[in-house]
Regions:
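Flexible, glycine-rich beta-alpha linker
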Residues: 14-38, 62-63
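Alpha-helical structural signal
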Residues: 18, 36, 40, 73-76, ...
């Protein structure tokens, strides 16, 4: 669609494709949120309710790429100055983490020491969904411009704890 508008109206419309986003102000509803906000909420509520375990779907092995929401904002500003092509561009961080690694990081950040119980009867999802951000890097975006998953999770968890229970999807 952006290509058609670009051609028809002569405007610099581009298509920037992120991967899995997370960060403050996300949707933390357990029924329809994405994996990271759901895990943050599950772990926090298990901690404050002194529950001995957190139940997670699947076996934790699928690998996913995640990008902190503030990084996407910076990348979009970068693209406004550096990209004027009709073809889509992938803009997400391509570091892969297993769901198990993510849950363990969230537990560590939140100080939850209960047990993780994997519900292997539930779907784990596709094992990998890799993307390539090489075009973005070729434009001059630096890999160091991405917030590490651990740092982004820390910021998101701290925000969630500070705002709980008045966060989207909880209150």
């Amino acid at each position: 669609m952006s290509r058609a508008y670009r051609q028809q109206y002569g405007c610099n419309f581009i298509t920037a494709i992120p991967n899995n986003l997370y960060g403050e102000n996300d949707n933390f509803d357990l029924e329809n949120s994405h994996v990271i906000p759901a895990l943050i909420r599950k772990v926090w509520e298990a901690k404050i309710n002194k529950e001995p375990s957190v139940f997670c779907w699947g076996d934790g092995s699928p690998l996913r790429e995640f990008t902190y929401s503030e990084d996407i904002a910076h990348i979009l500003l970068f693209l406004m100055e550096n990209y004027n092509e009709p073809n889509p561009i992938n803009i997400g961080n391509t570091d892969e983490y297993s769901i198990k690694e993510i849950v363990e990081m969230v537990c560590d950040i939140m100080g939850y020491d209960g047990k993780l119980e994997w519900q292997t009867g539930q779907p784990s999802g596709q094992h990998r969904k890799p993307s390539s951000n090489q075009k973005l890097l070729d434009l001059g975006w630096k890999k160091e411009g991405y917030t590490s998953l651990k740092e982004g999770l820390k910021k998101t968890c701290e925000w969630f704890i500070m705002k709980y229970p008045k966060v989207r999807g909880v209150s």
